[in-house]
Amino acid sequence: MSTLIASRRYASALLSAAEEGNFLNQIVDELHVIKEVLEHSRDLVYALRSPLVKGDRKIHILEEIFKDSVGEKMFLFLRLVAHKKRAGLLPEIIDEFQILLDEKRGVINVDITSATALSDEQTAELVTKLAAFTGKEIRPRMAINEQFIGGVAVKIGDTIYDGSISHQLQMLRKSLVS
């Protein structure tokens, strides 16, 4: 089974259980803690992915690291994942959980790239217009690309709306050449 499929199944099961048990906010908070630790500890991720580290040892490692920061329900999930030899997928499971949660809540990530940093007012106006355009809540991820000269490029899912001056000049150049 591919890692994406397995990750999505575990994430979906965790999301369903958290919703049914009415402890979704707790799980979301605890997953943020776990993700933060995993992002800052490459050795932990290697240990969880290593076939040389036995499942019981992985459970013990997870318990030692997270005993003061996650609840019993999350420990049950972590034990299950380790017991099923999927502890190495924890980063992917957490990412898939966030994707599923965002889909359920109607939130989308939007990459906004500009030549210079947008002001708070410009960002708010752009986010408002994008929310009206998509019908969803927008989570903006801002970036700066100095090669743009000016303008903004917006990436929503797989679609890019490029309103940068450099892109417009490139399109003008193509039309003049052909």
Curated annotation (Swiss-Prot):
Subunit-level organization: F-type ATPases have 2 components, F(1) - the catalytic core - and F(0) - the membrane proton channel. F(1) has five subunits: alpha(3), beta(3), gamma(1), delta(1), epsilon(1). F(0) has three main subunits: a(1), b(2) and c(10-14). The alpha and beta chains form an alternating ring which encloses part of the gamma chain. F(1) is attached to F(0) by a central stalk formed by the gamma and epsilon chains, while a peripheral stalk is formed by the delta and b chains.
Keyword rRNA-binding: no
Domain of life: Bacteria
Organism: Pelodictyon phaeoclathratiforme (strain DSM 5477 / BU-1)
GO molecular function, one term: proton-transporting ATP synthase activity, rotational mechanism
SUPFAM superfamilies in UniProt: N-terminal domain of the delta subunit of the F1F0-ATP synthase (SSF47928)
Compartment(s) of residence: Cell inner membrane
Alphabetical list of NCBIfam families matching this protein: ATP_synt_delta
Annotated protein name in UniProt: ATP synthase subunit delta
Protein function: F(1)F(0) ATP synthase produces ATP from ADP in the presence of a proton or sodium gradient. F-type ATPases consist of two structural domains, F(1) containing the extramembraneous catalytic core and F(0) containing the membrane proton channel, linked together by a central stalk and a peripheral stalk. During catalysis, ATP synthesis in the catalytic domain of F(1) is coupled via a rotary mechanism of the central stalk subunits to proton translocation. This protein is part of the stalk that links CF(0) to CF(1). It either transmits conformational changes from CF(0) to CF(1) or is implicated in proton conduction.
Keywords: ATP synthesis, Cell inner membrane, Cell membrane, CF(1), Hydrogen ion transport, Ion transport, Membrane, Transport
GO cellular component labels: plasma membrane; proton-transporting ATP synthase complex
Pfam family, one: OSCP
Stated family: Belongs to the ATPase delta chain family.
InterPro entries xref list: ATP_synth_OSCP/delta_N_sf, ATPase_OSCP/dsu
Main location: membrane
Bilayer topology: Peripheral membrane protein
